Amino acid sequence: HEKELIEALQEVLKKLKSKRIPIYEKKYGQVPMCDAGEQCAVRKGARIGKLCDCPRGTSCNSFLLK
């Protein structure tokens, strides 16, 4: 299970490096919607916010970023 988490976090880091988050998303906490089943990071502490939010009625594959 730990290996899956590490792989998921590495994937997120790759995405973050290749895609800048617009300032308004940081400022107002607005995040893009993710596709059903897509992994979305859940805010844990002040370090990093959600990468995407789940549309209503769908379940996302979420994990915590510490």
UniProtKB/Swiss-Prot annotation:
One of its GO terms (biological process) is chemical synaptic transmission. It is found in: Secreted. It comes from the Eukaryota. Its main location: secreted. Disulfide bonds join 34-52, 40-60. GO terms for cellular component: extracellular space; synapse. One of its GO terms (molecular function) is neuropeptide hormone activity. SUPFAM superfamilies: Satiety factor CART (cocaine and amphetamine regulated transcript). Keywords: Cleavage on pair of basic residues, Disulfide bond, Neuropeptide, Neurotransmitter, Secreted. It holds the Pfam family CART. Belongs to the CART family. Satiety factor closely associated with the actions of leptin and neuropeptide y; this anorectic peptide inhibits both normal and starvation-induced feeding and completely blocks the feeding response induced by neuropeptide Y and regulated by leptin in the hypothalamus. This is Cocaine- and amphetamine-regulated transcript protein. It comes from Sus scrofa (Pig).
